[in-house]
Amino acid sequence: MNANKILIILVAIAAISIYAVVTAPAADMPKLNGFVETDIGLKVNDDKLASKNGYNMAEQRAEFKLRYFPDKLAILKQWNTEIFFKTDVLMDEYMEQPKWWGPRELYIAFTPLSFADVKIGEQILTWGTGDYIFINDQFPKDYTSFIIGRDDEYLKLPSYAGRLTLSSKLASLDLVAIPAFTPNNVPNGNRISFFDPLFDRIVGTQSNRYFVEPPMKIDNTEVEARLYRTINSYQWDTNYNHGYYKSPVGYKNQQTGLLYYPELDTYGASIQGPVPIAGGIANFETGLLDSKEDDYAKNRLVQDSTAQYLVGYKRGFKNDFEVGLQYYIIQMLHYTAYKNNLLAGDIQNDKVYQQYTLRLTKLFANQTVNTTLFVFYSPVDNDVYLRPSLSWKATDAWNLVVGGNIFLGNQDNAAWGQYKGDSNIYCRLRYSY
């Protein structure tokens, strides 16, 4: 999403920031922190379909972060105003060009009333109970970063939004308005090959898909709401989203590869809390993803509505060892109509998709070494995605991470198996200041 579309908001925030900083006493000046990092990711099963062979990540990155609490103006101090700015400068050797990412976050937050918090600007939005699984969290994600081995921080993309949180003893309410659409960053064949139904095979640079985003106008503003309350250590959430699919799951023109982001309403709920007797934390989340343009599966060019369910459990054990399990189901709601409207050559999806996940975490050396294995497995597609990693916090400033993204499966159109030609091992070295 081009930042120019929300130029007025960002300029206003920047103007307040500059005024606050310029007029602040030297002792109250905001402090700069962040990190510099170098990353390398080598392919271990290269299908030679992407634009570069042998690797899919080689980059140097610098992050700059400023947080400031202005108090020069009485009203800013009274409202506990916070100005936050975070940006990355990236030298992406895979793309052979430096990239100024612009602000990853740039917002102003304040509390005008004792029960109301406001945040306006570019910000990371997230909710839900899943571990790498998102049902009611319909905010944008960067799955390319996820697959090539960037830090988990880069999985979630910022949104240009206004957020209002209202709190009371009875419950709390989050209201979010997003006037500028931000899509998921999905594999497009340049860096990561993928299964393209237009070719009926795994493709790379030869893919010629084009994505059409909803234009920025009042009628296209996305609205999110979350009502939540904690009762006896159990958090109950209800969620609503009115917006668009963040991945291009609709065709405007199938012959020319013109895809778009159909309208979507999401209704969901979740609960999370401790498990009696057995110990640990359990969660349950469900959501109805109502595809507004599929006409009860009569439109074969648009994603059908689905009901989704997630059950999770995690527990810590002695010696800094933790286990997490999840079971995830996606059920198509109008499957008979969906099948009846398929054409010859169309790929028929399963009515029910199932996926299991496992997370194992063990800390060593006074918790300075963290070893993790995360596994996705689908008995429907019979594919596996392994995410092993080992991180070593050598000092307060230096951190080294080595890991991998390993994809296994025989079906080219499987959710994870389609990336088997992109399996990689990576290394990240970071210095924080």
Predicted regions and their residues:
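Repeated loop/turn-to-beta-strand initiation elements of outer-membrane beta-barrel proteins
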Residues: 72-83, 116-118, 170-173, 233-236, ...
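Detector for outer-membrane/organellar transmembrane beta-barrel domains
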Residues: 77-79, 243, 274-296, 300-376
